[in-house]
Every structure is written in structure tokens, then in C-alpha cells.
Amino acid sequence: MPKNKTVHENCDILVVGGGMAGTGATFEARHWGRDLKIICVEKANIDRSGAVAQGLYAINCYMGMRWNENQPEDHVRYARNDLMGLVREDLGYDMARHVDSTVHMFDEWGLPMMKDKKTGRYQREGKWQIMIHGESYKPIVAEAAKKSADKIYNRIMITHLLMDENKENRVGGAVGFNMRTGDYHVFRAKTVIVAAGGASHIFKPRAVGEGMGRTWYAPWSNGSAYALPIAAGAKMTQMENRIVLCRFKDGYGPVGAYFLHLKTYTQNANGENYEKKWYDQTKELV
């Protein structure tokens, strides 16, 4: 039986995770660091990995600043109300002011976007979302990452960040193993960007059997984005927030298409539109 190898790599920027965040970070790193050696490491395959692996029917945030539809301040206000004040407004503002240019980039790269034939604007699903034909969403962004990175490592599960032996509280790389061969990989880097997955299925989902792997969010998001920096001593923020998504019988996908695009409503076992029935009482509670 062959002995597992230890593979060493040195680079300027190491991106941990090859989902939408990781592939985007790889592209952005190349934009600002033309001469840097950039490596992206993904536990699956970047073509179909992360929460957007199978595609989406919508981009869930687009300001529309070029048409004066929304401004970053509007999104900060929305987030503040939605999270009852438990929000880093500076982070929300930064995300909101950059999101439009990112969407325009997707459009340029060939992502099929639904547009109003008269105005040319992106078709809205609600106040923030825009509609797309998103089966190719992830492969398109993965292609940009492939062109940007010096190397892409697929099937490598990063387990720990390495601390710099010369500088206190500084990360100097990461280690992991190949999930197919068992080979051990050691990455030394001047900068490490952790863009791994969040944590899904913390609570047991209602979906069982075959439906277990079809729930939203991605079942393979095991909290690496939190565990890796926490183990290295990083200060975390916004960890007091979590999202618990309500779903319907036999429906595993996002509900935005039902309510916002198709203008449907929900009813209880008695056939009643319960949201409308209890709307006034619910407002009093809130």
C-alpha cells in the first residue's frame, strides 16, 4: 500500500474555500495583486461547490443605484430593522455599496439576467432581489477564479490555520488533506483569506430521507468559516445572529419565488389565509 505524501506549497495569498466567496476573493486578489502568487483551496470542486452549487433563480441583493432604486443607506436601515439593532452597520454599508458593481460583472461574464424590455432594468422580484436564469451562476464565477489563480486545489479539506512562528497572533498558512488520496498538504502564505462555508443544519431539519440533502441552505456547510479563525484566536463579530428558515410541507427551496415573484400566499389546514387573518394582531405583537 503506497504511503501518503506530504505536499508543500508557498504563496503570497491563500484563499480557503472555493464557493462564491472564495472564487470571488480569488478574482479580487488578482485584480489588486497582479504579480502575486495566489492559490485557492476547495474541499469539493469549485465548478459546483458552495451554497450556490446548483444555481439560483435570483440574486438576493441589488441596490440599483444607477437607476436610483435604492441606496446603501436604505439597505443598512433594512438590516437594522430586520435584526432589531443587532447589526454592524459599517459592514452592511460596505457590502451594499459594492454589490451593484459585482452584479454588473456577472452580467458581463454571461450570466443570463432577466431584464425589462422597455427600460433595460433588471427584473425585480421584490425590493432587493433581481431575477436570473442561474443554473450557470457558479461555473461562471469559478471560471473567473481559474483564470485568476496560479493554482486551484480541489478536494483538499483545510483543517487548521498555521500560526506564524516569528510574529505573534499572525496566521502564516494552513494545513489540510486530500479527500481522495489522503495526501497531507501544507500551505505557507503571507496572507490567508478564510472564505469557507457557514454552518447549516445546526438544528435537525424537518426534511428527512432524500429531502435531507435538498434543504436550503447547503447541507455541506459545516461551519469551517467560524471554526478555522476561532481556533486561531480571531475575534468574531455578529455571532449572536442566526437564521432559522420557515419552510412548507414538501417544499425544500427558497420561498422568495413563491411570495414575491408568483404573488402566492400560504394557508393553513383549514384553507385559511392565516397571515391576512392575523395581520393586525401580529402587528400589535411586533
What are these regions (language model features)?
Residues 8-11, 181-191:
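Core beta-strand elements of the Rossmann-like FAD/NAD(P) dinucleotide-binding domain
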Residues 17, 189, 195-196:
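Short, well-ordered coil/turn residues at beta-beta hairpins
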Residues 194-253:
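Glycine-rich loop(s) and the adjacent beta-strand/alpha-helix scaffold that form part
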Residues 1-12, 20:
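Generic start-of-chain signal for non-secretory N-termini
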